[in-house]
C-alpha cells in the first residue's frame, strides 16, 4: 500500500514546483510591464505642463522654467486662487490670443497631489496612495486619459510672447495607454 504513495509523492512535488515556477514567471512579467510603462509615462508627469500645477508651493508656477506665477498669484483655500484673485479671473474656458492659457476648470492640484520635489519613486508612491491622490486606480486612468485640464497639456497654445508652448514628450494617446498598462499590471513603483 505504501508503494503508490511513493510514486505519487515525487509527481505531486513536481506539480507544486511547476505551479510555483509558473507563478514566479507570471508575476515578474506583469511587474516588468508595469515598471516599464511607468518609466516612460513619468516623463509626462515631470514635464512643466503637469508640474507647474502639481506644485508643492502655495502658488502656481508657469513656463518651462517653472517660475513663480506673475502677479503674486496664490493657491488659495480651494486651489482656485484667493477670493480676490481666482484662477478664472484670467484663465477663461479656452487659450486666449494674449497667451493666457485656458480651461473651464483651471486650478492647482491639491497639495496632497504635489509632485514637485519628489523623485520618480516618490511620485509613483503618491499616485498609488489613495489618501494622497484621492483617486482609485480606475479613477486615475480616467483622469489621465479624459480630464480636459490634463489634456490641455497637448493643446497649450502660445505663451505671452506668442511662441508655441512646449508639449509633453509623447502624444496624449500614448501617455494614456501607458497609464492603462501601468495600472492594469499592478501600478508597480520603482525601487
Enumerate the predicted regions with their spans.
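N-terminal export/targeting leaders of redox proteins
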Residues: 1-42, 62, 73-78, 95-191
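N-terminal, post-signal-peptide region of Sec/Tat-exported proteins
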Residues: 46-80
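The canonical Cys-X-X-Cys-His
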Residues: 48-57, 84-94, 179
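Short, well-structured alpha-helical interface segments that form or flank functional binding sites
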Residues: 36, 48, 82-85, 174
Amino acid at each position: 500500500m505504501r508503494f503508490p504513495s511513493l510514486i505519487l509523492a515525487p509527481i505531486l512535488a513536481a506539480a507544486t514546483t511547476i505551479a510555483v515556477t509558473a507563478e514566479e514567471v507570471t508575476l515578474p512579467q506583469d511587474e516588468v510591464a508595469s515598471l516599464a510603462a511607468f518609466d516612460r509615462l513619468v516623463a509626462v508627469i515631470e514635464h512643466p505642463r503637469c508640474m507647474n500645477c502639481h506644485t508643492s508651493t502655495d502658488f502656481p508656477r508657469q513656463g518651462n522654467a517653472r517660475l513663480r506665477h506673475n502677479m503674486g498669484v496664490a493657491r488659495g483655500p480651494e486651489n482656485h486662487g484667493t477670493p480676490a484673485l481666482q484662477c478664472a479671473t484670467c484663465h477663461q474656458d479656452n487659450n486666449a490670443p494674449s497667451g493666457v492659457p485656458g480651461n473651464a476648470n483651471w486650478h492647482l492640484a491639491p497639495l496632497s497631489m504635489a509632485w514637485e520635489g519628489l523623485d520618480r519613486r516618490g511620485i509613483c508612491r503618491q499616485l498609488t496612495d489613495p489618501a494622497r491622490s484621492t483617486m482609485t486606480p480606475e479613477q486615475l486612468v480616467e483622469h489621465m486619459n479624459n480630464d480636459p485640464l490634463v489634456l490641455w497639456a497637448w493643446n497649450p497654445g502660445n505663451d505671452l510672447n506668442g511662441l508655441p508652448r512646449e508639449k509633453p514628450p509623447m502624444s496624449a494617446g500614448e501617455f494614456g495607454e501607458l497609464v492603462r498598462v501601468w495600472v492594469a499590471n499592478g501600478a508597480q513603483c520603482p525601487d
